[in-house]
From Swiss-Prot:
Lumenal-side segments: 62-65
The reaction(s) this protein catalyses: an acyl-CoA + a 1,2-diacyl-sn-glycerol = a triacyl-sn-glycerol + CoA; all-trans-retinol + an acyl-CoA = an all-trans-retinyl ester + CoA; 2-(9Z-octadecenoyl)-glycerol + (9Z)-octadecenoyl-CoA = 1,2-di-(9Z-octadecenoyl)-sn-glycerol + CoA; 1,2-di-(9Z-octadecenoyl)-sn-glycerol + (9Z)-octadecenoyl-CoA = 1,2,3-tri-(9Z-octadecenoyl)-glycerol + CoA
UniProt similarity note: Belongs to the diacylglycerol acyltransferase family.
EC number: 2.3.1.20, 2.3.1.76
Protein name: Diacylglycerol O-acyltransferase 2
Group of enzyme by EC: transferase
CDD domains linked to this entry: LPLAT_MGAT-like (cd07987)
Reported function: Essential acyltransferase that catalyzes the terminal and only committed step in triacylglycerol synthesis by using diacylglycerol and fatty acyl CoA as substrates. Required for synthesis and storage of intracellular triglycerides. Probably plays a central role in cytosolic lipid accumulation. In liver, is primarily responsible for incorporating endogenously synthesized fatty acids into triglycerides. Also functions as an acyl-CoA retinol acyltransferase (ARAT). Also able to use 1-monoalkylglycerol (1-MAkG) as an acyl acceptor for the synthesis of monoalkyl-monoacylglycerol (MAMAG).
Cited InterPro entries: DAGAT
Localization in the cell: Endoplasmic reticulum membrane; Lipid droplet; Cytoplasm, Perinuclear region
Length: 361
């Protein structure tokens, strides 16, 4: 209001310079407010995914069970009936929706960090692929944004390639959450699903496996570049059985967005985490990011740190119906070497010193 009064006063005095100055002040205030709104939209878009990841499945399960005890019980019956008939859909690649993958909310999600996808080589649509994604981080936010949405234009960068991000099969037993995940092209990380996608779904499929899994998330912390890979060879065996090329993929900055309490080996905290990992498939982490309204407080919103996912050169894999351990070890060693090479080639571009070494555990 003061700005408008100043402009009007300038008109009365006949001073054009005052009018121009007042209008400039007005536009600067408008753009400042717009920038704040934009930032809050980014924060909200990230928070909705974090909450979906953490509590949507459990919350919807509780609500659905409660609905059985209300006048709306028919809704619960209809959904459970649908669930029975649709139970195996996730194992066949799910039910992706390009509309959901192109939601504007994912662009706000991308810009919050920001997240970018770097392509180094073309992929042939006549081949199938298994991407090894590293590191896991706390939630694999880079993997989700790059391969389960179109925010970083994965379909334009790799035309004709259908990405499937693989995650815990238990997520697809959760009502509503399973629909949400499938709409983004997310599938269970189990042998049945991967066998189907690599043998009965044509060519041009790319299955993204976060190789380190829950074990790797336990060591996720800012400033650490380490992968759990030395004894992870199942994905190599699957690639050999189907002749699917292996693609090393490293996400710089994935470990920077959350801080967590690291329990020492042998401590009670680590014992609890390993038991959860063994029997349930995930390891509970004590972590924090920033608050919803301030970066100076703790909360569930990840820190705004750049995440850059670099997709490396595919390793051509022959098809062997019964690969021997020697075959698996050979191509696993080739994969590890390719991943380390990819890390070394790009580390200085994203803020790491030349002396930084990728730790392979």
């Amino acid at each position: 209001m003061k700005t408008l009064i100043a402009a009007y006063s300038g008109v009365l005095r006949g001073t054009g310079s005052s009018i121009l100055s007042a209008l400039q002040d007005l536009f600067s205030v408008t753009w400042l407010n717009r920038a704040k709104v934009e930032k809050q939209l980014q924060v909200i878009s990230v928070l909705q995914w974090v909450l979906s990841f953490l509590v949507l499945g459990v919350a919807c399960s509780v609500i659905l069970m409660y609905t059985f005890c209300t006048d709306c019980w028919l809704i619960a019956v209809l959904y459970f009936t649908w669930l029975v008939f649709d139970w195996n859909t996730p194992k066949k690649g799910g039910r992706r929706s390009q509309w959901v993958r192109n939601w504007a909310v994912w662009r706000y999600f991308r810009d919050y960090f920001p997240i970018q996808l770097v392509k180094t080589h073309n992929l042939l649509t006549s081949r199938n692929y298994i991407f090894g994604y590293h590191p896991h981080g706390i939630m694999g936010l880079g993997a989700f944004c790059n391969f389960s949405t179109e925010a970083t234009e994965v379909s334009k960068k790799f035309p004709g390639i259908r990405p499937y991000l693989a995650t815990l099969a238990g997520n697809f037993r959760m009502p509503v959450l399973r629909e949400y995940l499938m709409s983004g092209g997310i599938c269970p990380v189990n042998r049945d699903t991967i066998d189907y996608l690599l043998s009965k779904n044509g060519s041009g499929n790319a299955i993204i496996i976060v190789v380190g899994g829950a074990a790797e998330s336990l060591s996720s912390m800012p400033g650490k570049n380490a992968v759990t890979l030395r004894n992870r060879k199942g994905f190599v065996k699957l690639a050999l059985r189907h002749g699917a090329d292996l693609v090393p993929t490293y996400s710089f900055g994935e470990n920077e967005v959350y801080k967590q309490v690291i329990f020492e080996e042998g401590s009670w905290g680590r014992w609890v985490q390993k038991k959860f990992q063994k029997y349930i498939g995930f390891a509970p982490c004590i972590f924090h990011g920033r608050g919803l309204f301030s970066s100076d407080t703790w909360g569930l919103v990840p820190y705004s740190k750049p995440i850059t996912t670099v997709v490396g050169e595919p390793i051509t894999i022959p098809r062997l119906e019964r690969p021997t351990q020697q075959d698996i070890d050979l191509y696993h060693a080739m994969y590890v070497q390719a991943l380390v090479k990819l890390f070394d080639q790009h580390k200085t571009k994203f803020g790491l010193p030349e002396t930084e070494v990728l730790e392979v555990n």
